A protein has these predicted regions:
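An active-site-proximal beta-strand-loop segment
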Residues: 129, 133-168, 174-175
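Conserved, non-catalytic sequence blocks in retroelement Pol enzymes and Pol-derived host proteins
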Residues: 48, 87, 131-132, 149-150, ...
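Helical coiled-coil/dimerization "stalks"
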Residues: 1-25, 30-32
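Mobile genetic element proteins and their domesticated derivatives, centered on retroelements
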Residues: 9, 29, 39, 61, ...
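Basic, flexible linker segments flanking DNA-binding modules
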Residues: 1-7, 36-135, 229, 284-293
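Active-site beta-loop-alpha junctions of metal-dependent nucleic acid enzymes
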Residues: 148, 152, 170-193, 209
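RNase H-like two-metal-ion nuclease catalytic core shared by retroviral integrases
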Residues: 113-117, 202-204, 210-212, 224-244, ...
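C-terminal domain-tail junction helix/linker
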Residues: 218, 242-304
Length: 304
């Protein structure tokens, strides 16, 4: 606390000098309740090597934190620091972050917003909570989430590849029509080269049991969350919670246009390209898929 006061006095003194004004340092110190001798000792203190390194690490922490759109906590920042060669513990990073007054965005656990529309036994849970396929385009999952704006709710439909947790397609709409889901599925099919059987998993919402959806996914194996167990779709439900926690909830969103711009920025410039994920060995989804493709290609060359 005292160091912060000294820093404030120093900054105000420098600002006054640059402006050509006189300022009473003693008066400021007296008003703030700190000693002149203590301030002068602080002012002429030469940082030790340890202090210099600590401040350098804190600067790196701030850069990583800002680059993550101020989302990363100590675990992910520790991983990123170690990638640059820093030898540091997660506990130390957490201590520094506390001193710096920064922390990860907090989120309450995601809540269920979808009501099942079909409880028939014909809809099978093929996925059965097996959330870790061994290749891309083995399992996709899809879901819809509500986003509040001043103009009214808009709806984000997403398709995730469970292998990398990459959002491979998304659509923002002003209605809950099944056509919005179909558009998203078609985008996903156009962007991915599907040459093997594919499972697509969803909850039992009306859009996902409609005949139009079944037609759009006729060459896929449709899998549905069990009756009254929508958390069987936990990965993409969790993603929708994360995009709100890390990004959308910071803004008082005016309308569809602003919501679209914010979602585009988060998904296309951060989530798939930069945001590290524990599931991906602390790589981004794009990097995780590139590593798979490179390893898979090398294995094929060695085998052939």
């Amino acid at each position: 606390m005292t160091e912060a006061i000294y820093l404030e006095v120093s900054e105000k003194t420098e600002a006054a000098k640059k402006a050509g004004r006189r300022v009473s340092v003693s008066g400021m110190l007296k008003f703030l309740g700190v000693s002149r001798s203590g301030y002068l000792a602080w002012l002429h203190h030469v940082p030790s090597d340890t202090e210099t390194r600590r401040e350098a690490v804190k600067a790196k922490i701030q850069d990583i934190y800002d680059d993550s759109k101020q989302n990363y906590g100590a675990p992910k920042i520790t991983v990123e620091l170690r990638k640059t060669g820093e030898v540091i513990s997660e506990r130390t990073v957490g201590t520094y972050m506390h001193q710096m007054g920064i922390r990860a965005q907090w989120s309450k656990p995601w809540t269920i917003t979808t009501k099942d529309s079909d409880f028939s036994t014909e809809l099978q849970n093929i996925l059965d909570e097996q959330f870790n396929p061994d290749r891309p385009n083995a399992v996709w999952c899809s879901d819809i989430t509500y986003i509040w704006t001043i103009d009214g709710f808009v709806y984000l439909t997403s398709v995730m590849d469970l292998f990398s947790r990459k959002i491979i397609a998304w659509t923002l709409s002003e209605t809950l029509e099944v056509s919005c889901v179909i558009d998203t599925i078609n985008k996903a099919k156009a962007r991915r080269n599907i040459d093997q059987p594919l499972i697509i998993h969803s909850d039992r919402g009306s859009q996902y049991v409609a005949k139009e959806y079944k037609k759009a996914t006729e060459n896929m194996q449709r899998s549905y969350s069990k009756k009254a167990f929508p958390w069987d779709n936990a990965c993409i439900e969790s993603f929708h919670s994360i995009i709100k926690r890390e990004w959308l909830n910071r803004f008082k969103i005016r309308d569809y246009k602003q919501a679209y711009q914010l979602i585009f920025e988060y998904l296309e410039a951060f989530c798939n390209t930069k945001r590290i994920h524990s599931h991906c060995n602390y790589m981004s989804p794009n990097e995780f898929e590139r590593v798979y493709e490179r390893t898979h290609t090398e294995a094929e060359l060695l085998a052939g």
